[in-house]
Amino acid sequence: QAVAIGNHDCSSASYQNHFNNPNPFLEESTPTPAGNGYFYSYGNALFIVINANNYNAADHKALIEKAIKENPNAKWRIVVMHQDIYGSGLDHSDSDGIILRTQLTPIFDANDIDVVLQGHDHSYARTYQLTSDGQAHDEFLEYKQDQGGFNHDNFDERFEKDGVFRAYYKSQNLCYNIADKSQGTVVNPEGVFYLTSNSATGSKFYNLIPEQQDYVAARSQNWRPSYSVINITKDSFTVNTYDVETGEAIDSSYTIIKK
């Protein structure tokens, strides 16, 4: 079982008592008590698991570069992290999720990441192929904590009460371009594909943001658990997502072909 450290896991060492991850990135400058990011290869895919509770993007950049250097022949480069930077849930997508967006989007783009698997929003979302816009954006460093965390209370209060700040914050997080809106099967696409999983256990669900974001190709909240099945071959990455209770697909199939 290869898991990412979640926001409810990061403040204690309990996670480390349950999981013995391969290739832990011990060079992180601001790790959380739960541990570090790590990486592993499976078949022709390289999986890089980020501890996104650490808001120091330089650590994640270094981990990605190290993983790629040690696995130069991996056909597929897949990042896994708990926080979603391109989701569609009401509680996180427009707050702590996008505080990481301006930092991680160009890093993923520069390192030719194919897919980013995310959670956190307790709702399902699938994006188009996205690239960095190549522009400089505010990283809102005043809300980062010394240990690599994020000051949610101060940020949330200002975001809620200060309309000018809220508008500026959202404008700075328009740090992406939609590279390809094709559906079904895309061949040698530009950009990165982001998938946000809903709860697989049904422990908690969040509403979707009322207005679907332009980067979202499909989304769902039926208030029931769902799961995704990913099939990776030499030349293809395919994802299908199903309702746990009924077994029915909640979204159309999406395939990336790399020749």
Spans of model-derived segments:
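Extended active-site neighborhood of metal-dependent phosphoesterases/phosphodiesterases
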Residues: 1-73, 77, 103, 129-218, ...
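Extracellular low-complexity, Gly/Ser/Thr-rich intrinsically disordered linkers
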Residues: 42-46, 81-85, 211-253
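Short acidic, glycine-rich surface-loop motifs adjacent to enzyme active sites
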Residues: 71-91
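Short, flexible/disordered intra-domain loops and linkers
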Residues: 90-98
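Active-site glycine-centered loops adjacent to acidic/histidine catalytic or metal-binding residues
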Residues: 6-7, 82, 119-120
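Functionally important transmembrane alpha-helices
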Residues: 115-117, 223
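Catalytic-core regions built around general acid/base machinery
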Residues: 101-112
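Short active-site segment of divalent metal-dependent hydrolases/proteases
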Residues: 9, 85, 123
